[in-house]
């Protein structure tokens, strides 16, 4: 009898998982001219979404860096983790806020500690990116600086003046993230203080800036993350305004997405695949990093949500193989691995008496 009940439960679980994973949920993709008040008529809620917009992605967590496995040197801990990036060899770079030990820590893809640097160098780590030449860029928002390193940790360039916020061509005020266009120009979301985007050429020479504080077109309340797609469109996560604004490389506003909630971090791959980590709205985001957060895969042309999964997160990156790394202020980096056998794992849930992995 017990065996029959288990088999019945297994069948129901598998059916439920299959339906959720394969059936897209209703959603609308608003354009820039759809008023927020009209949004429900268009098929979506501006500051909310179903449990899994688009479709539930078949991913599972393979590793939680900093916990599974625990391979860091004795005495080293993450504290809050602000950002993560990878290099061409698949190594994982973690930017952590605990300043008692090195704040930039490198692992291999299986979580083995490789090296680290930057003890006491950063006031408040924020963004971390790898450029096409495999240099590592770190943004210290409270120190008002942007650093360029080799993968081994050699400092190559420093932009901004330490502990001196400003809004001219050579200073920042709490910069948050960096991205590059096809010509190698850098775009910095600057940030908590200036509420602007700064464009620099590949040598670090000031080119242009745009944006002021506010909620109008082209204004920002907090440009928290930035990304550039294959067509050189510049995406700015205007987090406190619950929107993503998209510009050309000259700072001209092209369109605005208001259906993705309070976006924390964005990443657009060389293959033009877009990933975000987001919350429904600022009320939810005040906790900074909760299980209410979602990682979403987005169509860069339309803004359509292609799939999602629940995950706490602050910043994220992805590999060409589709592995997603999410940096969490809870003190982890989650490695989300595509899992073709995900629905079949329901039997493990029955054996352990817990729901199947999400």
Which stretches of residues belong to each language-model region?
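Bacterial N-terminal signal peptides
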Residues: 8-18
């Amino acid at each position: 009898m017990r065996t029959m009940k288990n088999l019945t439960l297994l069948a129901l679980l598998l059916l439920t998982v299959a339906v959720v994973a394969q059936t897209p949920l209703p959603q609308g993709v608003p354009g820039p001219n759809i008023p927020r008040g009209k949004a429900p008529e268009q098929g979506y809620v501006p500051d909310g979404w179903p449990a899994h917009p688009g479709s539930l992605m078949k991913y599972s967590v393979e590793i939680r860096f900093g916990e599974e496995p625990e391979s860091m040197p004795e005495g080293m801990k993450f504290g809050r983790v602000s950002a993560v990036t990878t290099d061409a060899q698949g190594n994982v770079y973690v930017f952590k806020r605990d300043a008692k030990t090195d704040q930039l820590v490198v692992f291999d893809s299986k979580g083995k500690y490789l090296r680290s640097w930057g003890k006491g160098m950063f006031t408040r780590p924020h963004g971390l990116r790898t450029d096409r030449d495999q240099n590592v860029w770190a943004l210290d928002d409270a120190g008002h600086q942007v650093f360029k390193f080799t993968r081994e940790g050699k400092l190559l360039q420093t932009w901004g003046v330490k502990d001196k916020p400003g809004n001219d061509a050579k200073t920042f005020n709490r910069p948050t993230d960096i991205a590059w266009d096809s010509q190698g120009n850098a775009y910095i979301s600057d940030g908590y203080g200036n509420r602007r985007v700064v464009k620099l050429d590949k040598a670090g020479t000031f080119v242009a800036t745009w944006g002021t504080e506010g909620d109008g077109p082209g204004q920002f309340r907090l440009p928290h993350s930035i990304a550039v797609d294959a067509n050189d469109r510049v995406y700015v996560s205007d987090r406190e305004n619950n929107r993503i604004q998209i510009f050309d490389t000259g700072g001209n506003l092209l369109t605005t997405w208001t259906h993705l909630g309070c976006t924390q971090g964005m990443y657009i791959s060389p293959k033009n695949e877009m990933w975000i980590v987001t919350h429904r709205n600022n009320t939810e985001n005040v906790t900074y990093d909760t299980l209410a957060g979602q990682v979403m895969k987005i169509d860069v042309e339309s803004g359509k949500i292609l799939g999602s999964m629940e995950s706490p997160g602050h910043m994220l990156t992805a590999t060409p193989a589709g592995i997603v790394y999410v940096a969490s202020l809870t003190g982890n980096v989650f490695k989300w691995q595509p899992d073709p056998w995900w629905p079949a794992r329901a039997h493990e849930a029955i054996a352990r008496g817990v729901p199947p992995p999400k």
